[in-house]
């Protein structure tokens, strides 16, 4: 298990402090919440002379079509978006029909797609 530090969790609102922390903390890997954001991050890092995965490993979530068109190809979690959508619609229909009112835990399987944006350390 890899621990993260709350002060190293960034959003689009805190991107400027991300840039500062990147130089201060020198991480080996970055976890990004979406493939499109990862694409933009990789482009920005490349413009700074930073190479992926040589300098930083990057992993993302979603396994969108962007993951296979960027360079390097993006290592990403496939979160099974179709099944997630189907389950959401089932739940919504059940609520609208008053068939289900109690919260219910639903687990949608996901898996890691290993490509080129991560290296061993």
Which positions does each model-derived feature cover?
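Bacterial carbohydrate/catabolite-sensing allosteric modules
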Residues: 1-121
């Amino acid at each position: 298990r890899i621990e993260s530090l709350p002060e190293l969790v960034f959003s689009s609102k805190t991107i400027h402090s991300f840039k500062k922390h990147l130089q201060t903390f020198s991480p080996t890997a970055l976890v990004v919440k979406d493939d499109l954001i990862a694409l933009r991050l990789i482009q920005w890092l490349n413009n700074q002379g930073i190479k992926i995965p040589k300098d930083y490993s990057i992993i993302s979530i979603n396994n969108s079509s962007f993951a296979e068109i960027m360079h390097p190809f993006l290592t990403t979690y496939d979160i099974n978006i179709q099944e997630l959508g189907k389950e959401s619609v089932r739940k919504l229909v059940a609520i609208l029909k008053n068939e289900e009112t109690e919260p219910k835990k639903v687990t949608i399987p996901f898996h890691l797609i290993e490509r080129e944006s991560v290296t061993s350390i």
